[in-house]
Design a protein with these regions (language model features):
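Immediate post-signal peptide segment of exported/extracytoplasmic ligand-binding proteins
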Residues: 26-40, 59-60, 129-135
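Extracytoplasmic "Venus flytrap"
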Residues: 36-55, 72-76
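Short helix-initiation/N-cap motifs at beta->coil->alpha
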Residues: 68-79, 166-194
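Beta->alpha turn/N-cap motifs
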Residues: 70-74, 84, 89-98, 115, ...
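Ligand-binding "clamshell"
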Residues: 99-111, 126, 198, 203, ...
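A conserved helix-loop-strand patch within extracytoplasmic ligand-binding domains
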Residues: 111-161
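Periplasmic-binding protein-like
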Residues: 113-122, 148-155, 211-254, 256-277
Length: 277
């Protein structure tokens, strides 16, 4: 290779390196997601998505297009949020989120409240809790948090008495008094509506009650906004810590927490699911 050829080769090689470094720098500075892409909002399958879709319909009129993505597994919405596959989710309460952050190391924070989703004790056989006979079966969720909620509500109904100080963390072992010797059966929460054919009464959360056609107004007893369990039936929006102040996220939540969406929620769910604002 002549001196001239070597010089031309070196010049071309250096030019290539320059272009490569420029291209890499441009790529590194590219935005993660263009603002013209829809805001992806995760939710558990069921009625909560109906409210989000109404908010999305209204937010599009204000320039914020949102895509509502439903998950059937409750572990997925936070995992997808942490991974950046969605921008926001709305399916959980603060205690559930706090536990997920603690156990899984998620960098996710709670934002504004969205819905109140009180549970009730339902029966297909009795119209009053007092009519439930001795030895009958009553059903509660088999997960610790909601199991405690259920036991508190059965205590409110006058059917059992819990040990002092157990509250939301109570288990079946914390039942201090059971004068009717009721059999307390622990069942997967999603199966509780179906259990009503086989038990005297069951604790059913609002999403499963709605899907099963149960009306909270017909419950033997229901949670109210002054209950100790309120944090457990108040849903919140959640976002990644580094995007909690994202203008599009804040705008969507503002639209969600508006009077038109409140009116929609009250009209559609007739008290079974309530706006939290």
């Amino acid at each position: 290779m002549t001196f001239l050829s070597r010089s031309r080769f070196l010049a071309l090689f250096l030019s290539g390196l320059t272009l490569l470094s420029v291209g890499t720098a441009v790529h590194a500075q590219a935005p993660a997601a263009p603002t013209d892409k829809p805001l992806k909002v995760g939710v558990s399958a069921g009625p909560y998505g109906d409210v989000l879709r109404e908010a999305a319909r209204l937010s599009e009129k204000q320039g914020i297009k949102a895509e509502i993505i439903e998950f059937t597994d409750w572990n997925q919405p936070n995992a997808a949020l942490q991974a950046g596959d969605i921008d926001l989710n709305n399916f959980q309460n603060r205690p559930y989120l706090a536990n997920q952050v603690k156990t899984r190391g998620y960098q996710i924070v709670a934002l504004d409240e969205s819905l109140l989703v009180p549970a009730g004790i339902y029966s297909r056989k009795y119209t009053r809790a007092a009519d439930i006979p001795a030895g009958a079966k009553i059903a509660i969720p088999n997960d610790p948090t909601n199991g405690g909620r259920a036991l508190l509500l059965f205590q409110k109904a006058g059917l059992i008495q819990l040990k002092p100080g157990t509250g939301l963390y109570a288990s079946v072992l914390d039942v201090a008094e059971n004068p009717k010797k009721l059999q307390i059966v622990e069942i997967d929460a999603a199966q509780l509506p179906r259990s009503l054919d086989d038990v005297a009464a069951a604790f059913v959360s609002s999403n499963y009650a709605y899907l099963a056609g149960l009306d909270l107004n017909t419950a033997l007893v229901a949670e109210t906004a002054v209950e100790e369990a309120k944090p457990y039936f108040t849903l919140v929006f959640a976002a990644r810590e580094d995007r909690k102040d994202d203008p599009r996220i804040r705008k969507f939540i503002e639209v969600y927490r508006s009077q038109p969406v409140k009116d929609f929620t009250l009209a559609k769910f007739k008290g079974s699911i309530l706006p939290a604002w």
